Amino acid sequence: MAHPTQLGLQDASSPIMEELLLFHDHALMTVFLISTLVLYIIMTAVSTKLTNKHLLDAQEIEIVWTVMPALVLIAIALPSLRILYLMDEINDPHLTIKATGHQWYWSYEYTDYDTLNFDSYMIPTQDLLPGQFRLLDTDNRMVVPTGSPVRMLITAEDVLHSWAVPSLGLKMDAVPGRLNQTTFIATRPGVFFGQCSEICGANHSFMPITIESAPVKYFESWSSSMLAES
């Protein structure tokens, strides 16, 4: 999760987020190099005696400032397109979960089980226990097995929402009457927080997302207890 005064993105907890972090660093380095070059040209132009101020034609430099930006754009576009295709790949998921956005909470349905579904509300500030996070913790966490491919089906019941968990590299719009899908693999155990990322009304800020990644044995125990309660 994010921390006060943090610089950079959250720690990656999925393969896609690791790819996004690498692309982020790649893009920032490209911007840094371009900025350094532009600053050097400006400083050189300021300090020169303008001996070529009447020069009207320079084919070589025109070729350079046409080809170089094209190469830079290609260097940014290719890894970006690769990540976009990776995010669309869904290969043999071990678990499918349907998340539905409401004003203002989320409901989850484990479609591989007959009756495993529940609502997930933000815990009010006055009900928080020691160690729980204000505006982030929920009364029911979405539990997934660590290291297993999980397919998410995202929709909404009323207005537009967006299901987003930054440390897993997830952000998918929840649209009424439409099913969007994405996939992720939690590479380590832990609790990951997200929030609705589409303004959806007065309590938009109060519909967090809490995902708990746990070993398979714990997940099986949790699912059995949830099925017994239902």
Swiss-Prot record:
Pfam families in UniProt: COX2, COX2_TM
Catalytic activity: 4 Fe(II)-[cytochrome c] + O2 + 8 H(+)(in) = 4 Fe(III)-[cytochrome c] + 2 H2O + 4 H(+)(out)
Cellular localization per UniProt: Mitochondrion inner membrane
Annotated residues for binding of Cu cation A1: 161, 196, 200, 207
Alphabetized PROSITE patterns for the sequence: COX2, COX2_CUA, COX2_TM
Protein EC: 7.1.1.9
Segments on the Mitochondrial matrix side according to the record's topology features: 46-59
Binding site for Mg(2+): 198
InterPro entries: CcO_II, CcO_II-like_C, CcO_II_C, Copper_CuA, Cupredoxin, Cyt_c_oxidase_su2, Cyt_c_oxidase_su2_TM_dom, Cyt_c_oxidase_su2_TM_sf
Stated role: Component of the cytochrome c oxidase, the last enzyme in the mitochondrial electron transport chain which drives oxidative phosphorylation. The respiratory chain contains 3 multisubunit complexes succinate dehydrogenase (complex II, CII), ubiquinol-cytochrome c oxidoreductase (cytochrome b-c1 complex, complex III, CIII) and cytochrome c oxidase (complex IV, CIV), that cooperate to transfer electrons derived from NADH and succinate to molecular oxygen, creating an electrochemical gradient over the inner membrane that drives transmembrane transport and the ATP synthase.
Protein known as: Cytochrome c oxidase subunit 2
Organism the protein comes from: Polypterus ornatipinnis (Ornate bichir)
